[in-house]
C-alpha cells in the first residue's frame, strides 16, 4: 500500500527476508489480458485519466477506471470483464513493480513532489515515475511530455524499448 512508508520497520523486515512485495497494480495486472492504459505525472493525473476513461466509455468500449481513482483495480479484475483499464498511477505504486506492463503509458509532467520519500532527490523521484515504461516492449506505447526537461534528460539515459510518442504545448511535432 502506498500508505505504508518504504522506510517502515515492517517493510524493512520483509525486504530483509527476501519476500516479494507487490503493489495492487502489479498484482491485478498479472490476472488480466485487458489492455492497460496507465497515467502518471506530478500534476493532472486524475483529470487525464478521467478524460481518457470517458472517451473510451462513450465509444461503447468495455472499460474500467482504477488505480488512485475509481474502484479497486484488483476487485475489477476479479469481478468484471473489461477489455481496457484506465489507471491513475502514483510514483509510490510504481516503486515496487517488477512485471507491470501497460499497453499505453502516459507521463504527463514532472515537478519536485514527494521528495521526502525519495531522499530529497528530484531525479530519484523522476526515475520512479519512469518505471511506468520499464517493462514495456516495442509493441507498447509511451507518451511523454517533450517540454519537460527532466523527461528529456532521462529519455537520453534510459534504455526503453517502447515506442515513444512525444507531445508538446510549445512546439509543433512531426509524425
Please identify what each model-predicted range represents.
Residues 2-146, 150-162:
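Phosphate-binding loop of NTP-binding sites
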Residues 161, 165-175:
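Short, intrinsically disordered, charge-balanced linker/junction segments flanking boundaries
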Amino acid at each position: 500500500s502506498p500508505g505504508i512508508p518504504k522506510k517502515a520497520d515492517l517493510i524493512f523486515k520483509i525486504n530483509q527476508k527476501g519476500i516479494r512485495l507487490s503493489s495492487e497494480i502489479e498484482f491485478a495486472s498479472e490476472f488480466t489480458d485487458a489492455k492497460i492504459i496507465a497515467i502518471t505525472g506530478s500534476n493532472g493525473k486524475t483529470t487525464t485519466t478521467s478524460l481518457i476513461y470517458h472517451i473510451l466509455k462513450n465509444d461503447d468500449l468495455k472499460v474500467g477506471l482504477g488505480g488512485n481513482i475509481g474502484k479497486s483495480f484488483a476487485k475489477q479484475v476479479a469481478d468484471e470483464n473489461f477489455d481496457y483499464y484506465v489507471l491513475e498511477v502514483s510514483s509510490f505504486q510504481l516503486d515496487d513493480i517488477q512485471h507491470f506492463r501497460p499497453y499505453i503509458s502516459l507521463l504527463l509532467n514532472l515537478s519536485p513532489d514527494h521528495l521526502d520519500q525519495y531522499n530529497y532527490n528530484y531525479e530519484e523521484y523522476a526515475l520512479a515515475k519512469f518505471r511506468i515504461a520499464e517493462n514495456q516492449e516495442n509493441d507498447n506505447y509511451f507518451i511523454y511530455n517533450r517540454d519537460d526537461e527532466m523527461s528529456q534528460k532521462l529519455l537520453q539515459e534510459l534504455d526503453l524499448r517502447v515506442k515513444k510518442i512525444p507531445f508538446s504545448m510549445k512546439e509543433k511535432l512531426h509524425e
